[in-house]
Amino acid sequence: MTTVTICLRGGLVHRDSDGRKQVFGAEILSAKKNDDGPYGGKHTQWLTFGKGIVHELMFDNMRRRGQLGHRGTSILHQELYQIWVDLPSAKRMVNPRVELLGGEDETPTVEHQGTTTTVIAGEHYGKAASVDLTSDLTILRVEMRAHSSWKHNEAKQHGTMIIYMRTGSILIGSQIVSAHCTAHLTSDGDEVKIIAGQEGADFLFLSGKPLGQNVAARGSMVAGTNADLEKAFADYESGDMGTPWSERYSDNDWRTHVAKYRKTKMKP
């Protein structure tokens, strides 16, 4: 699987068994210009688990913008989307990969007649996200002013389309979709047309070409079959994916833990 984590409010801290630490957040998700800000302009993480990795993703409750403090001393409002994207079967056992995205070069915005569309994956009206996709899909965050209209030319092969309403309401054909509701659409290659309600709208648009393959899940593991799941749990127990650490570990303790694990694994 790949998880796509889009931070809408607050911030997140990632650490993993390959020794990577990443911090990303929401300050400029809808910004008009590239701006480093406290999170370096990054608001979205793509984490491809592939053959397996141990990781933690914690809310960034640290005082930022130059203030002194430690995690937990300042509680921020937090809100995010996390989307699980299946990998094609031929690519399920790739090496783990983590990528942060943000800004016009990586997640461009399209502004048109009262609407703002942030392209997280795929393309919208000639602007494409930079992430290298393993399958044919589109992820858009759409913000609309009251009574504005939004259109999207969807690929005919995208048999699956989903809209999740964060706030406000929209009209699709004769159907009203309200906040916190999900609309499932079919694609025939025509243009998707949406009109915002009197309070405007903020929604997530997802579409993709169906992979038509099995998915098995248990606990924190996702694989293709039950046999693959058993192999994944065995790999985890043996330490092939990394060894867990306490979320209370400081960065120094975590790095020492990861370095010790790597050193152990390198022995014949």
List the predicted regions and their residue ranges.
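Jelly-roll (double-stranded beta-helix
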Residues: 1-268
